[in-house]
Regions:
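ABC ATPase C-loop
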Residues: 155-156
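ABC-type ATPase nucleotide-binding domains, specifically the catalytic core motifs of the NBD
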Residues: 19, 60, 75, 100-119, ...
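Conserved catalytic motifs of ABC-family nucleotide-binding domains
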Residues: 159
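Helix-to-loop junction immediately C-terminal to a conserved catalytic motif
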Residues: 55
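Conserved ABC transporter NBD signature motif
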Residues: 63-72, 83, 117-121, 223
């Protein structure tokens, strides 16, 4: 079992390009097991591209990604998912025409028995109580916030060691934002490591252990979450939308 003091995920010298634009430039950071770490910065700073690079989703990228000490470079996204690294993009990718339960079933890697599948869905429903009474509902008939929770729940079906979340509170009603951040704290308590990209700086830092700030594709600052929460100068300089 990995020590909480050793990195679960390490990024070394990450670079990424869109056409000729060098969007992520020589980024290096780590996330330890059991942490919530937030990537912060203005729009266009390179946060989402960093997540996509970690998942092997960009054709033009370089650098090393280590997960549990093992290199991931050269492996496609599905292999990284099998290794225990999950990713929920901002667009959610909920499958229309399927129920909440059927969407959850898509998150299972193996081929469990019906009883095992039902048991896992019941476990997930306890962690995501808003979905519990909606399992038979057509998934895209739910609100955007509920669909976001479904996307996260689906990623959690395979019991990943770590999950990458891209702007989970974007466009969601405040009451659901509160519920979502309570959910992230609950997931951490259950042993899930989280790397979070989030524009809601105050809420993200309130549940995070540490944060890295990106500006123009580079990490320009890192600190404990509480120190950053108290540093209004850094927030206004790098994190205002």
């Amino acid at each position: 079992m990995m020590s909480a003091f050793k990195p679960l995920l390490e990024a070394r010298g990450l670079n990424a390009w869109y056409d000729r634009s060098h969007v992520v430039q020589d980024i290096a950071f780590e996330v330890r097991a059991g942490e919530i770490v937030t990537l912060m910065g203005r729009n266009g700073a390179g946060k989402t591209t960093t997540l996509r690079t970690l998942m092997g989703l960009l054709a033009k990228a370089s650098g090393e990604v280590l997960f549990e000490g093992r290199p991931l470079q050269g492996q496609p996204a599905h292999a990284r998912f099998h290794a225990g690294l999950a990713y929920v993009p901002e667009d959610r990718r909920i499958v229309a025409g399927l129920t909440v339960r059927e969407n959850l079933q898509l998150g299972i890697i193996a081929s469990p028995s019906r009883g095992e599948m039902d048991a896992r869905i019941d476990e997930i429903a306890e962690t995501f109580p808003r979905l519990k009474e909606r399992l038979a509902q057509e998934a895209t008939s739910m609100s955007g916030g509920e669909q976001q929770m479904l996307a996260i729940a689906r990623a959690m079906m395979a019991r990943p060691k770590m999950i990458l979340l891209d702007e989970p509170s974007e466009g969601i009603m405040p009451v659901l934002v509160d519920e979502m951040f309570e959910l992230f704290a609950r997931m951490k308590g259950q042993g899930t490591t989280i790397l979070l990209v989030e524009q809601n700086v105050e809420r993200a830092l309130s549940i995070s252990d540490r944060a890295y700030i990106l500006d123009q594709g580079r990490i320009v600052h890192q600190a404990g979450a509480q120190a950053l929460l108290a540093d209004e100068d850094i927030q206004s300089r790098y994190c205002a939308v």
